[in-house]
Amino acid sequence: MTRVLFHSLTIPPDNVSTGKLVADIANKFSENGQHIEILASTPQYNFDESVFNNELIQIKEKKLYSSSYKNVKINHIYSSQRSFNQQKRIFQWISFHYRSIRYLIKHRNTFDVLYIFSYPPTMNLVAIISKKLLKKKTIYSVWELYPEIASKLSEINSKLIIRLFKKLDNYALKIIDDIVVNSDELKEYLINSRGIQENKIKVIYHFSSSEESPRPENHNKEIIYTGNLGIPQNIESFIKNLNNSSDQYKLKIYGSGSRYEDIKKMESENINVNPYTDRSEILKHTKNSTFALVSLSSSLTVEGFPGK
């Protein structure tokens, strides 16, 4: 039986949609007869200290915890609460990678395949170490492509840094065994713009394992947005257009991110901005909204959609 270790930054009980996708994919592998474990961080996006007190997460050793998702064992590397400061965030990534790599080296005999999910973008370093140092079969799932996203959103303005990061990322993509992307367009981009061999790229489309919400009993002019409030989402642009519209639509926002405070300042009679809200509560609010908003900066196409 092949022993596969999934490696992701986020995973349940952290209430992040990408983390749940990873957990659901891992669980399907397990149901199909593979020996699966997950290596991820402790909850940091929607941080809740109670998960350490209600036995959802149990301590194994210093800065290492364990939990489970359905029938899949999860190993959690301790991470502090997510910072929206860019410099602090990069330091958090480095700290997470350092502890992850130490774990992989120490437990190298417990897995045959490492299946890595690409956020943060510096996960390519782990992919290189897995393949070149540990000599493991390595699968790299790319949902968002960097440095293209950072460049288009002007998050990185140094051409030298962009060029060096792209070389590093391309090196990782070329030496690993398989690449998984979430759209046919991203596959074509990697082939045509990055020079990646077509036969090593597979496509797994994004999906939802949640039940469909019931349709609202009465149609109204209420729009709901739930999720990340960062630069890529560009919610501010939609709010400005909504405020300039003669139609009396109401927008309710639930989320967190680097742009939350700025978006909060844009509240008005028709714009209601709320912090992160538990999923069970969100589902109650969706019942009263006729429309759902999916927002993405117009400068992003294949590099970040549908990953964003």
How would you describe each model-predicted region?
Residues 5, 208, 216-233, 239-246, ...:
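Conserved donor-binding/catalytic core segment of Leloir-type glycosyltransferases
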Residues 166, 170-200:
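A short, active-site helix/loop in glycosyltransferases that binds the activated sugar's phosphate group
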Residues 252, 260-283:
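Nucleotide-activated donor-binding/catalytic signature segment of Leloir-type glycosyltransferases, i.e.
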